[in-house]
């Protein structure tokens, strides 16, 4: 269920121009941004390229500007995918389901800090971690952006309000599958949902858009605004 799309347009893992800091949350190095006194936290879970990706950190800063305490943990333990490594080999030691226990430890640490509500957004690889948290109601609201490894049974099992942002061109979660996800969410009258497929973009565009692709840039901005609106509605 993983392929070249997960690896396209890898980020340059350089730091600088960020508003936040790297701190330790539970046992994980984490990029944190925003009001440390906020009672609402947003956890962003990266794709295979990890928590150091500049565009992911800039998105974290943007979410933080809405008044949230934003945490981007290093669930890859300092070992993000590098383009020279076959992704199937890398995944043997970096399964998203195995990261759920670490995600729960981050959530526990945030609650101990005084956080009362937690939302989570997962990108590609990270979406699987988020959906597992949503199935156990470990968070109050979920967002899955161009998800990988997420199944229809996963979506049927979520217990919190869930948004899914999909791409028109995506072999990992093609529009047909996203529409099935939407039907499953509609059938769950206990939760709210938001599903949208963005035209003209491909898997990974929300955090790995190409700067010279006007459509991808526009749709990334649109998706970011939709994500913020979703959190504002549910939190």
Predicted segments — roles?
Residues 1-235:
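N-terminal cap/leader regions of alpha/beta-hydrolase-fold enzymes
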């Amino acid at each position: 269920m993983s392929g070249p799309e997960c690896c396209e347009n890898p980020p340059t893992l350089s730091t600088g121009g960020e508003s936040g800091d790297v701190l330790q949350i539970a046992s994980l190095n984490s990029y944190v941004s925003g009001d440390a006194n906020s009672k609402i936290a947003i956890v962003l879970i990266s794709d295979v390229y990890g928590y150091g990706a500049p565009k992911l950190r800039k998105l974290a800063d943007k979410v933080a500007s809405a008044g949230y305490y934003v945490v981007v943990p290093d669930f890859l333990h300092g070992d993000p995918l590098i383009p020279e490594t076959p992704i199937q080999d890398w995944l043997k030691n970096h399964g998203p389901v195995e990261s759920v226990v670490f995600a729960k430890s981050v959530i526990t640490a945030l609650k101990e800090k005084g956080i009362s509500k937690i939302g989570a957004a997962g990108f590609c690889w990270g979406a699987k971690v988020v959906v597992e948290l949503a199935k156990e109601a470990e968070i109050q609201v979920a967002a899955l952006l161009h998800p990988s490894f997420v199944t229809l049974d996963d979506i049927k099992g979520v217990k919190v309000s869930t948004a899914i942002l999909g791409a028109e061109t995506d072999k990992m979660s093609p529009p047909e599958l996203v529409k099935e996800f939407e039907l499953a969410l509609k059938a769950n009258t206990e939760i709210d949902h938001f599903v949208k497929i963005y035209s003209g973009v491909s898997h990974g565009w929300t955090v790995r858009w190409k700067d010279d692709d006007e459509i991808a840039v526009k749709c990334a901005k649109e998706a970011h605004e939709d994500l913020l609106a979703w959190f504002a509605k549910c939190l």
